[in-house]
A protein has these predicted regions:
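Conserved acidic catalytic loop of the alpha/beta-hydrolase fold
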Residues: 52-70, 83
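Active-site nucleophile loop of the alpha/beta-hydrolase fold
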Residues: 37, 99-109
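Short beta-strand/loop motif that positions the catalytic acidic residue
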Residues: 179-180, 185-188, 192
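Gly/Ala-rich beta-loop-alpha elbow adjacent to hydrolase catalytic centers
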Residues: 73-83
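Short, surface-exposed "cap/lid" segments of acyl-processing enzymes
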Residues: 1-41
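Short alpha-helix in the alpha/beta-hydrolase fold that links the catalytic acid
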Residues: 22, 196-210, 236
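Acidic catalytic loop of the alpha/beta-hydrolase fold
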Residues: 106, 190-195, 228-230
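Catalytic active-site module of serine/aspartate enzymes centered on a nucleophile-bearing elbow/loop
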Residues: 4, 214-264
Length: 264
């Protein structure tokens, strides 16, 4: 069977430019779809994308190329699009696997995510760069202040069960026992100044234990030692991410160990 295609969604910044190293390492023998968000990459766009429009565009693109589903890879704000897909009746059937980098979608009910990025004063070099070149840029600031709806963007671990290769409603207590392989990878940054990584990692660990108790392993969590987005400029971690994407693209993934991995 052919490998699953990839849908990649970038985060806040300058579009795909600082993801070129990662994109260049994606598998060469499958289709790659790149979803650009002009409203958060320093373009003069007043409004962000509508949820339904985004879901329909991604679903239609996959259908046009004959792909029933895909591996969704997203960084930072781009992970909200994955949340939209998983919450949509049609969209969730298109999400076979995911690789989420610095996801801002977990525990969004915690106000620190939006507050830290938009309103907090920077305290280190990385924070200064993000503050002056990203969060205070006119159109990015407008997008985050006026078009970021946490209740639509939030993701729960149970949402992974919407994926097409697991096929269970997140309201169901019945976790299939015959899909004992990891379909989803979450990579967090231990020094993240935006995502509350401590609470998020503890939440995901607890959900891993809960899912295992029901006889199902569907996601893993890895930890990068660095700040938000820094993993994308470390060649070793770019290779690690690319390897995870390659694994998720396999039509029949092997069983991998699940756990919270702390790597430098």
């Amino acid at each position: 069977p052919a490998k699953l295609p990839i849908v990649f969604i970038h985060g806040i910044g300058i579009g795909f430019a600082h993801y070129l190293g990662l994109i260049a390492n994606f598998p060469k023998d499958t289709d790659v779809f790149l979803l650009e968000w002009p409203h958060v990459c320093m373009q003069m766009v007043k409004e962000g994308p509508k949820i339904k429009d985004t879901v329909d565009i991604l679903c239609d693109a996959l259908d046009d190329f004959g792909h029933p589903s895909a591996v969704f890879v997203a960084h930072s704000l781009g992970t909200t699009a994955v949340s939209w897909m998983l919450h949509d009746p049609r969209g969730c059937t298109k999400v076979a696997r995911t690789v989420l980098l610095d996801p801002v979608t977990f525990l969004l009910c915690d106000p620190r995510v939006a507050t830290v990025f938009v309103y907090n004063n920077p305290t280190n070099t990385v924070d200064f760069l993000m503050h002056f070149f990203l969060s205070r840029e006119l159109f990015i600031s407008n997008a985050l202040s006026r078009h970021f709806n946490w209740s639509h963007n939030i993701m729960f671990a149970e949402d992974f069960l919407h994926a097409s290769n697991i096929g269970s409603s997140h309201d169901s207590d019945e976790y299939p026992l015959d899909n004992d392989f990891i379909s989803h990878t979450v990579i967090l940054s231990s020094l993240d100044s935006i995502v509350p990584v401590g609470p998020v990692s503890r939440y995901l660990e607890a959900k891993q234990d809960e899912f295992r108790a029901r006889g199902h392993n569907c996601f893993e969590v890895c930890m990068f030692h660095g700040n938000h987005g820094e993993m994308l400029v470390h060649p070793s971690w770019v290779n690690t991410i690319a390897r995870k994407v390659e694994e998720r693209c396999q039509p029949r993934p092997e069983q991998y160990d699940v756990g919270l991995n702390y790597d430098d």
